[in-house]
């Protein structure tokens, strides 16, 4: 079990380097199953979700070498089509990318339903719709998804996604790259990590066009070859440190970013009063005064990201006035507001909207991280608060943030990590 102890009240100052994108890495690692030969992947974030996926790939027979903290060489040439251990798959939502990758490589996939964060109904019906459009037979039974390609292999198909789905867009890409013919995916998600996955696959010999637009076309190829690739910086990690600097106050230079990916976050933080300067590959955030009020609605990219919703809510919790945060992607993502309420925040949730009446200060107490991004929000709130805060279940935070304690400590925060070796209780949002 992992806990953080945070002493609030210290402004942040200095620079922080952003790691590789979690949401790209957790799709690119399963994608190596499609490649004949070694893939050297740089800027891989050292986070627990990545470590779990590497365990799964090793169990399937992948040869994996690590060079330093953030470079991997993965060779899945001799990988076998095996059912991944359920105790690993159930701990990570992104394990569903194994379905597309295994179906594309072996023509068969048998994968346990994934775990990860739980903030509403997140079915995989759009993934299945895409696989079936390529001729696969898909069944869900006993907590598993079983998919089989037709005799002769997957064939190109035309898929219109009923909702904009990041996971479905990426999973269908994985299944389509080695199939025969052309696959067209309409109403695609456009997030930077989708473009990064497509760029990785193209670097290995795939023929994908249109990633980052509404329509992606995949012309199937017979094989992919090994190569080198560097994962893009993490948009959400960068946004989290931007929000922390704005909420806590101070002067922080956030390095190794792609400012274009952060446009909507930058615009909203400027609207609430942060002073932001953009450079070619860095962003500086300065904040010296109490933040202003602003309404926020999460949307698919290029809108304000749902993965930044808890962090911006913390910014508004101590801002002047009353404002609304509306969740436009998931059914519910406000469980963490009860934890903020324990710290003195005044937040009322009505359906998919949180009504926030800003308070002067938060106070330290004992809270828990209910999921990855909510956990990051708890850390920001704890740094804003008067006194000491104990954050339970901090293992959620380490699913997606590399060395968050070390990075924040370097910025002047007073935060300590405590790990005990109890067996964590099993819960529906474990992972």
Named regions from a protein language model:
Residues 1-431:
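Short, structured segments at the rim of ligand-binding sites
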């Amino acid at each position: 079990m992992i806990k953080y102890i945070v002493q609030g009240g210290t402004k942040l100052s200095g620079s922080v380097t952003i790691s590789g994108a979690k949401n790209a890495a957790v799709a690119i690692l399963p994608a190596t199953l499609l490649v004949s030969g070694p893939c050297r992947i740089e800027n891989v974030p050292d986070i627990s979700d990545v470590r779990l996926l590497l365990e799964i790939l090793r169990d399937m027979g992948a040869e994996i070498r690590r060079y330093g903290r953030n470079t991997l060489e993965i060779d899945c040439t001799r990988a076998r089509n095996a059912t991944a251990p359920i105790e690993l798959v159930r701990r990570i939502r992104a394990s569903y990318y194994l379905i597309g990758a295994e179906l594309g490589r072996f023509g068969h996939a048998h994968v346990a339903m994934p775990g990860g964060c739980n903030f509403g109904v997140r079915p995989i019906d759009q993934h299945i719709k895409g696989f079936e459009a390529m001729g696969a037979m898909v069944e869900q039974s006993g907590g598993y998804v079983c998919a089989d390609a037709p005799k002769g292999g997957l064939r190109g198909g035309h898929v219109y996604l009923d909702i904009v789905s990041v996971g479905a867009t990426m999973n269908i890409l994985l299944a389509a790259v080695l199939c025969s013919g052309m696959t067209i995916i309409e109403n695609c998600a456009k997030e930077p990590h989708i473009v990064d996955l497509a760029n990785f696959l193209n670097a290995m010999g795939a023929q994908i066009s249109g990633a980052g637009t509404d329509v992606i076309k995949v012309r199937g190829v017979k094989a992919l070859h090994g190569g080198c690739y560097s994962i893009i910086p993490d948009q959400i990690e960068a946004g989290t440190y931007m929000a922390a600097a704005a909420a806590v106050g101070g002067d922080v230079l956030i390095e190794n970013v792609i400012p274009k990916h952060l446009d909507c976050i930058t615009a909203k933080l400027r609207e609430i009063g942060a002073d932001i300067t953009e450079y070619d590959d860095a962003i500086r955030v300065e904040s010296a005064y109490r933040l202003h009020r602003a309404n926020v609605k999460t949307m698919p990219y290029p809108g304000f990201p749902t993965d930044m919703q808890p962090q911006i809510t913390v910014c508004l919790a101590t801002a002047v006035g009353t404002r609304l945060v509306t969740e436009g992607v998931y059914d519910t993502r406000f469980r963490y507001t009860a934890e903020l309420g324990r710290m003195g925040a005044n937040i009322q949730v009505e359906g998919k909207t949180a009504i926030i009446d800003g308070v002067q200060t938060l106070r330290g107490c004992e809270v828990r991280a209910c999921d990855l991004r909510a956990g990051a929000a708890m850390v920001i709130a704890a740094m804003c608060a008067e006194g000491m805060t104990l954050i339970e279940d901090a293992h959620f935070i380490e699913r997606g943030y590399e060395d968050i304690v070390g990075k924040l400590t370097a910025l002047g925060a007073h935060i300590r990590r405590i790990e005990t070796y109890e067996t964590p209780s099993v819960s529906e949002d474990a992972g």
